[in-house]
Design a protein with these regions (language model features):
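Bacterial N-terminal signal peptides
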Residues: 11-22
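Transmembrane beta-barrel domains of Gram-negative outer membranes and organellar outer membranes
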Residues: 30-312
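Sec/Tat signal peptide C-region and signal peptidase I cleavage site
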Residues: 25-29
Protein backbone atom coordinates (compact mmCIF):
# COMPACT_ATOMS: atom_id res chain seq x y z
CA UNK A 1 0.00 0.00 0.00
CA UNK A 2 2.84 2.39 0.80
CA UNK A 3 4.40 1.76 -2.61
CA UNK A 4 1.06 2.46 -4.29
CA UNK A 5 0.58 5.60 -2.19
CA UNK A 6 4.02 6.86 -3.11
CA UNK A 7 3.37 6.13 -6.78
CA UNK A 8 0.09 8.04 -6.80
CA UNK A 9 1.64 10.99 -4.96
CA UNK A 10 4.52 11.09 -7.47
CA UNK A 11 2.11 10.95 -10.42
CA UNK A 12 0.07 13.75 -8.86
CA UNK A 13 3.22 15.80 -8.26
CA UNK A 14 4.37 15.60 -11.86
CA UNK A 15 0.82 16.23 -13.07
CA UNK A 16 0.77 19.48 -11.08
CA UNK A 17 4.18 20.42 -12.50
CA UNK A 18 2.96 19.92 -16.08
CA UNK A 19 -0.24 21.92 -15.40
CA UNK A 20 1.68 24.75 -13.72
CA UNK A 21 4.21 24.83 -16.53
CA UNK A 22 1.39 25.29 -19.03
CA UNK A 23 -0.06 28.07 -16.87
CA UNK A 24 3.33 29.73 -16.83
CA UNK A 25 3.51 29.64 -20.62
CA UNK A 26 0.11 31.34 -20.84
CA UNK A 27 1.13 34.02 -18.32
CA UNK A 28 4.34 34.78 -20.18
CA UNK A 29 2.53 34.86 -23.52
CA UNK A 30 0.00 37.35 -22.15
CA UNK A 31 2.80 39.47 -20.75
CA UNK A 32 4.54 39.48 -24.12
CA UNK A 33 1.33 40.60 -25.85
CA UNK A 34 0.47 43.36 -23.41
CA UNK A 35 4.00 44.58 -22.73
CA UNK A 36 5.15 45.77 -19.34
CA UNK A 37 2.61 46.19 -16.58
CA UNK A 38 3.12 49.94 -16.41
CA UNK A 39 3.90 52.05 -19.47
CA UNK A 40 6.50 54.80 -18.93
CA UNK A 41 5.50 58.44 -19.31
CA UNK A 42 6.05 59.91 -22.75
CA UNK A 43 9.02 62.00 -21.60
CA UNK A 44 10.63 59.23 -19.52
CA UNK A 45 13.79 57.63 -20.93
CA UNK A 46 13.22 54.16 -22.36
CA UNK A 47 14.67 51.41 -20.20
CA UNK A 48 17.04 48.94 -21.82
CA UNK A 49 15.12 45.80 -22.78
CA UNK A 50 15.87 42.72 -20.71
CA UNK A 51 17.88 40.07 -22.58
CA UNK A 52 15.87 37.20 -24.05
CA UNK A 53 16.77 34.19 -21.90
CA UNK A 54 13.92 31.94 -23.02
CA UNK A 55 16.22 29.69 -25.06
CA UNK A 56 18.44 28.68 -22.16
CA UNK A 57 17.97 25.19 -20.74
CA UNK A 58 19.73 22.61 -18.61
CA UNK A 59 21.86 21.71 -21.63
CA UNK A 60 22.26 25.29 -22.88
CA UNK A 61 23.11 27.14 -19.64
CA UNK A 62 22.50 30.81 -18.99
CA UNK A 63 25.79 32.74 -19.43
CA UNK A 64 27.31 34.03 -16.21
CA UNK A 65 26.92 37.59 -17.48
CA UNK A 66 23.13 37.15 -17.59
CA UNK A 67 22.59 35.46 -14.22
CA UNK A 68 19.88 37.05 -12.10
CA UNK A 69 20.72 38.26 -8.59
CA UNK A 70 21.43 35.45 -6.13
CA UNK A 71 18.17 34.78 -4.23
CA UNK A 72 18.19 31.65 -2.05
CA UNK A 73 15.04 30.65 -0.20
CA UNK A 74 16.81 30.66 3.14
CA UNK A 75 17.16 31.84 5.81
CA UNK A 76 13.49 32.71 6.52
CA UNK A 77 10.59 30.29 6.12
CA UNK A 78 9.43 32.24 3.05
CA UNK A 79 10.43 30.89 -0.35
CA UNK A 80 11.81 33.12 -3.07
CA UNK A 81 9.64 33.60 -6.16
CA UNK A 82 12.63 33.41 -8.53
CA UNK A 83 14.17 30.22 -9.89
CA UNK A 84 17.74 29.06 -10.38
CA UNK A 85 19.00 30.07 -13.83
CA UNK A 86 18.90 27.37 -16.49
CA UNK A 87 21.87 25.00 -16.40
CA UNK A 88 23.11 26.19 -13.00
CA UNK A 89 23.27 24.36 -9.66
CA UNK A 90 22.64 25.79 -6.21
CA UNK A 91 22.69 24.40 -2.70
CA UNK A 92 21.32 25.87 0.53
CA UNK A 93 21.81 24.34 3.97
CA UNK A 94 21.63 24.80 7.69
CA UNK A 95 25.03 24.24 9.22
CA UNK A 96 23.44 23.89 12.65
CA UNK A 97 19.85 24.30 13.84
CA UNK A 98 18.57 24.09 17.42
CA UNK A 99 15.00 24.41 18.68
CA UNK A 100 13.29 24.05 22.06
CA UNK A 101 9.56 23.54 22.61
CA UNK A 102 7.66 23.60 25.93
CA UNK A 103 4.19 22.15 25.42
CA UNK A 104 1.90 19.80 27.31
CA UNK A 105 4.23 19.52 30.30
CA UNK A 106 7.10 18.31 28.11
CA UNK A 107 10.26 20.10 26.98
CA UNK A 108 11.53 18.95 23.58
CA UNK A 109 15.01 19.80 22.33
CA UNK A 110 15.97 19.18 18.73
CA UNK A 111 19.42 19.53 17.15
CA UNK A 112 19.81 19.30 13.40
CA UNK A 113 22.94 19.51 11.25
CA UNK A 114 23.24 19.85 7.49
CA UNK A 115 19.84 19.73 5.78
CA UNK A 116 20.82 20.61 2.20
CA UNK A 117 18.47 21.74 -0.53
CA UNK A 118 19.89 20.96 -3.97
CA UNK A 119 18.49 22.98 -6.87
CA UNK A 120 19.00 22.61 -10.60
CA UNK A 121 17.78 25.11 -13.20
CA UNK A 122 15.90 23.27 -15.97
CA UNK A 123 14.67 26.24 -18.02
CA UNK A 124 14.68 30.00 -17.55
CA UNK A 125 11.58 29.73 -15.36
CA UNK A 126 11.55 26.19 -13.87
CA UNK A 127 13.94 24.52 -11.45
CA UNK A 128 14.00 21.12 -9.74
CA UNK A 129 14.73 20.83 -6.02
CA UNK A 130 15.62 18.05 -3.57
CA UNK A 131 15.56 18.85 0.14
CA UNK A 132 17.16 16.42 2.59
CA UNK A 133 16.31 16.95 6.24
CA UNK A 134 19.68 16.32 7.87
CA UNK A 135 20.80 14.37 10.89
CA UNK A 136 18.55 15.10 13.87
CA UNK A 137 18.84 14.38 17.57
CA UNK A 138 15.67 14.75 19.65
CA UNK A 139 15.11 14.50 23.40
CA UNK A 140 11.82 15.05 25.22
CA UNK A 141 11.75 15.45 29.02
CA UNK A 142 8.84 15.50 31.46
CA UNK A 143 8.87 18.89 33.19
CA UNK A 144 7.49 17.51 36.48
CA UNK A 145 9.73 14.47 36.94
CA UNK A 146 12.71 15.20 34.70
CA UNK A 147 12.33 11.74 33.17
CA UNK A 148 13.00 11.20 29.49
CA UNK A 149 9.76 10.86 27.55
CA UNK A 150 11.34 10.22 24.15
CA UNK A 151 14.75 10.02 22.52
CA UNK A 152 15.40 9.69 18.83
CA UNK A 153 18.08 10.33 16.25
CA UNK A 154 18.44 9.81 12.53
CA UNK A 155 17.97 11.44 9.17
CA UNK A 156 14.74 13.22 8.35
CA UNK A 157 12.39 13.20 5.37
CA UNK A 158 13.16 14.05 1.74
CA UNK A 159 11.15 16.71 -0.11
CA UNK A 160 10.88 16.69 -3.92
CA UNK A 161 9.92 20.09 -5.34
CA UNK A 162 9.70 22.07 -8.54
CA UNK A 163 9.57 25.86 -8.54
CA UNK A 164 7.72 27.41 -11.50
CA UNK A 165 7.97 31.17 -11.92
CA UNK A 166 4.86 32.75 -13.45
CA UNK A 167 6.22 36.28 -13.82
CA UNK A 168 8.92 38.59 -12.51
CA UNK A 169 11.87 36.22 -12.83
CA UNK A 170 14.01 38.71 -14.75
CA UNK A 171 12.91 42.16 -13.71
CA UNK A 172 9.95 44.19 -12.58
CA UNK A 173 8.74 45.10 -9.12
CA UNK A 174 6.71 41.91 -8.54
CA UNK A 175 7.26 38.17 -8.91
CA UNK A 176 5.05 35.12 -8.40
CA UNK A 177 5.85 31.42 -8.35
CA UNK A 178 4.15 28.14 -7.49
CA UNK A 179 5.96 25.20 -5.89
CA UNK A 180 4.31 21.76 -5.82
CA UNK A 181 6.05 19.29 -3.51
CA UNK A 182 5.94 15.71 -2.25
CA UNK A 183 7.46 14.53 1.04
CA UNK A 184 9.05 11.07 1.04
CA UNK A 185 9.37 9.82 4.63
CA UNK A 186 12.52 8.45 6.21
CA UNK A 187 12.59 5.30 8.34
CA UNK A 188 13.64 7.13 11.53
CA UNK A 189 10.96 6.60 14.23
CA UNK A 190 9.74 9.79 15.98
CA UNK A 191 11.86 11.90 13.59
CA UNK A 192 9.49 11.02 10.72
CA UNK A 193 5.80 10.12 10.74
CA UNK A 194 6.45 7.54 8.02
CA UNK A 195 3.80 8.88 5.63
CA UNK A 196 3.95 10.41 2.16
CA UNK A 197 2.57 13.96 2.22
CA UNK A 198 2.44 16.86 -0.21
CA UNK A 199 1.23 20.33 -0.97
CA UNK A 200 1.44 23.49 -3.04
CA UNK A 201 3.31 26.70 -2.11
CA UNK A 202 2.77 30.13 -3.69
CA UNK A 203 5.28 32.93 -2.87
CA UNK A 204 4.63 36.48 -4.10
CA UNK A 205 7.38 39.11 -3.86
CA UNK A 206 6.99 42.86 -4.17
CA UNK A 207 9.67 45.55 -4.26
CA UNK A 208 8.54 48.45 -2.07
CA UNK A 209 9.76 52.07 -1.92
CA UNK A 210 13.01 52.84 -0.09
CA UNK A 211 14.47 49.41 -0.99
CA UNK A 212 12.17 47.37 1.23
CA UNK A 213 11.25 43.92 -0.01
CA UNK A 214 7.95 42.22 0.87
CA UNK A 215 7.12 38.53 0.53
CA UNK A 216 3.61 37.15 0.98
CA UNK A 217 3.34 33.37 0.90
CA UNK A 218 0.47 30.92 1.17
CA UNK A 219 0.67 27.14 1.26
CA UNK A 220 -1.82 24.30 1.42
CA UNK A 221 -0.75 20.81 2.52
CA UNK A 222 -2.34 17.37 2.76
CA UNK A 223 -0.95 15.96 6.04
CA UNK A 224 -1.45 12.91 8.23
CA UNK A 225 -3.69 13.32 11.27
CA UNK A 226 -1.92 13.28 14.63
CA UNK A 227 -4.05 10.55 16.22
CA UNK A 228 -4.82 8.20 13.31
CA UNK A 229 -4.06 7.46 9.67
CA UNK A 230 -6.55 10.00 8.31
CA UNK A 231 -5.60 13.11 6.36
CA UNK A 232 -6.29 16.78 6.95
CA UNK A 233 -5.71 20.08 5.20
CA UNK A 234 -3.09 22.42 6.62
CA UNK A 235 -2.76 26.10 5.70
CA UNK A 236 0.46 28.12 5.99
CA UNK A 237 0.57 31.90 5.62
CA UNK A 238 3.41 34.32 6.25
CA UNK A 239 4.51 37.90 5.75
CA UNK A 240 8.20 38.70 5.37
CA UNK A 241 9.83 42.15 5.23
CA UNK A 242 13.51 42.71 4.43
CA UNK A 243 15.89 45.63 3.98
CA UNK A 244 19.61 46.31 3.73
CA UNK A 245 21.33 47.13 7.02
CA UNK A 246 22.49 50.77 6.79
CA UNK A 247 26.23 51.28 6.83
CA UNK A 248 27.22 47.63 6.30
CA UNK A 249 27.71 46.62 2.69
CA UNK A 250 26.04 43.37 1.54
CA UNK A 251 24.27 42.81 4.88
CA UNK A 252 20.48 42.71 5.08
CA UNK A 253 17.94 41.86 7.75
CA UNK A 254 14.51 40.24 7.62
CA UNK A 255 11.54 39.86 9.95
CA UNK A 256 8.65 37.50 9.42
CA UNK A 257 5.30 36.49 10.88
CA UNK A 258 4.43 32.82 10.27
CA UNK A 259 1.27 30.80 10.89
CA UNK A 260 0.40 27.15 10.30
CA UNK A 261 -3.21 26.14 10.96
CA UNK A 262 -4.82 22.81 10.11
CA UNK A 263 -8.21 21.13 10.23
CA UNK A 264 -7.04 18.28 12.51
CA UNK A 265 -8.30 19.01 16.06
CA UNK A 266 -5.35 17.07 17.51
CA UNK A 267 -2.73 19.16 15.68
CA UNK A 268 -2.35 22.58 17.35
CA UNK A 269 -1.65 25.70 15.28
CA UNK A 270 1.83 27.18 15.14
CA UNK A 271 2.57 30.92 15.21
CA UNK A 272 6.11 32.37 15.17
CA UNK A 273 7.97 35.66 14.82
CA UNK A 274 11.16 35.12 12.85
CA UNK A 275 14.32 37.21 12.45
CA UNK A 276 17.37 36.78 10.23
CA UNK A 277 20.59 38.41 9.05
CA UNK A 278 21.87 37.70 5.54
CA UNK A 279 25.41 38.48 4.35
CA UNK A 280 26.34 38.22 0.67
CA UNK A 281 29.97 37.12 0.82
CA UNK A 282 30.33 37.03 -2.98
CA UNK A 283 27.77 37.33 -5.80
CA UNK A 284 27.30 33.55 -5.50
CA UNK A 285 27.88 32.80 -1.79
CA UNK A 286 25.57 33.77 1.09
CA UNK A 287 25.96 33.34 4.85
CA UNK A 288 23.03 33.70 7.24
CA UNK A 289 21.95 33.39 10.84
CA UNK A 290 18.62 33.77 12.55
CA UNK A 291 16.36 33.26 15.52
CA UNK A 292 12.66 32.36 15.51
CA UNK A 293 10.39 32.89 18.52
CA UNK A 294 7.16 31.08 19.31
CA UNK A 295 4.01 33.15 19.71
CA UNK A 296 1.95 30.31 21.16
CA UNK A 297 2.60 27.30 23.40
CA UNK A 298 2.68 24.69 20.66
CA UNK A 299 5.33 26.57 18.66
CA UNK A 300 9.03 26.17 19.44
CA UNK A 301 9.82 28.72 22.15
CA UNK A 302 13.06 29.50 20.35
CA UNK A 303 14.86 28.25 17.26
CA UNK A 304 18.35 29.43 16.26
CA UNK A 305 20.38 28.55 13.19
CA UNK A 306 23.31 29.42 10.94
CA UNK A 307 23.47 28.53 7.27
CA UNK A 308 25.20 28.72 3.91
CA UNK A 309 24.07 29.00 0.27
CA UNK A 310 26.15 28.82 -2.91
CA UNK A 311 25.50 28.93 -6.65
CA UNK A 312 27.55 27.36 -9.45
Amino acid sequence: MLVLAKSSWVRAFFGVVVFCAAAGDVARADQAKTGSQQQPAADAPAAAPAPDKSGYTLFNPTPDSQLRSFAPDRPPKADSATTVDAGHFQYETDLLNYSQTNFGGVTTRLYQAFDPVWKLGLTNWVDFELQFNGYQNLTATDNATGAAVAKASGFGDVFVKSKINLFGNDGGSAALAIIPYVKIPSDAPTISNGVVEGGLIAPFQLQLPHDFGLTLMSEVDALKDAADSGRHANFVDLVNLNHAVPGIKNLSAAIEFFSSVGTDPNTPPIYTFDTALIYLLTPNVQLDAGADFGLNRAAPAVQVFVGLSQRF
